[in-house]
Regions:
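Interaction interfaces in information-processing and related assembly proteins
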Residues: 1-176
């Protein structure tokens, strides 16, 4: 089993401030930044990078996050001022803001001749489910991914983070 986790509160809060994002955009980009940082850190090349791009057809537009192999990450969202209603009290509707009619594209630049590019159709626009789908479909690695951003009442980031857990080749059912 390969597992990686991140506490990304500081990264996501800094992005919120820099891009002057409203809560729904903060939650969406924060999830993508967390995923990119973990995936960048999982690479086997020290000077490589990974780019995650989501074009979901939702009002946020394109979301992009780029990470190096140390997990240093940056990103943007086309429309940071989008504010959507909550799914229910306390739960932002990130899936509706991102949209589910589009693609997640992952570009792994391992400093070889050509970068590896993999794309999958979005499952939900909630980002963690889409990352899971990417690993299962494009890399054939059974994966569990969870990503979260908790927005405080003053619109700052109270907490952000996530995890990726993957079964490695040869893993038995007992390990699961």
């Amino acid at each position: 089993v390969n597992a990686v986790a991140i506490s990304s509160t500081g990264i996501v809060e800094r992005a919120r401030q820099m891009h002057k994002m409203l809560p729904t955009a903060t939650a969406a980009l924060g999830r993508l930044l967390s995923a990119a940082s973990m995936m960048g850190n999982m690479q086997k090349t020290e000077d490589g990078s990974i780019t995650l791009q989501i074009k979901g057809g939702g009002p946020l537009g394109t979301l992009l996050a780029v990470s190096d192999a140390e997990g240093n990450v940056r990103g943007y969202v086309d429309h940071p001022q989008i504010s959507l209603l909550e799914k229910y009290r306390g739960k932002l509707d990130v899936g509706a803001a991102v949209g589910a009619d589009g693609m997640l594209t992952v570009i792994r630049d391992l400093r070889m001749k050509e970068p590896y590019v993999g794309s999958v159709a979005l499952v939900s626009g909630e980002i963690a489910e889409d990352i899971t789908q990417y690993f299962v479909q494009s890399e054939q690695i059974p994966t569990a991914c969870a990503l979260g951003v908790l927005i405080d009442t003053d619109q700052s980031v109270r907490a952000a983070g996530g995890y990726l857990i993957q079964l490695m080749p040869g893993a038995t059912d007992d390990m699961i």
